Amino acid sequence: MSHFTKKSDFMKNIHDDISDIYSSLRKMQSARDQLDDLESRLLDVKFSKILELSKRTIKLIDDTEFKLISPKQKTFQDVINFRNQLDAQFLDLLSKVDGNVPPITSGEMTRYKDLKLEWLKIKTGYDQIVSNIQDINTKLIESSVPFISRGGE
């Protein structure tokens, strides 16, 4: 396999991980919006277990999101104030690999392995979120919670 092919495959792996991170983020952010809406509709005490799990899941989403991106960054100057998170570190590595002439350096490979391990650790939080959402959906069905509220009743 040529150095250019190895570099291309390596860059594809990095790109796939970045795509996986952003896909997971979109799903978590959508789930958080839905859970926020659900909480506003479940004010009855009989739904307290659902609400508790929902609140824990939102907290887990917030914590996981913060490890992946810097949600507080709003302008280019915020890079100074807020630490780059995993997405920016992957993008930085991709940029460095793309800008270098093959072969891939051992430092780039080591950095990728470190970032990949970090992503896999963080992904356990995402997996727990998915599991919590399945539990919430089961509890909603068991509790006969109406899918569409009747205007805040």
Short names for language-model regions:
Residues 1-96:
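Extracytoplasmic/secretory ectodomains and luminal regions
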Residues 86, 90-153:
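C-terminal amphipathic alpha-helix
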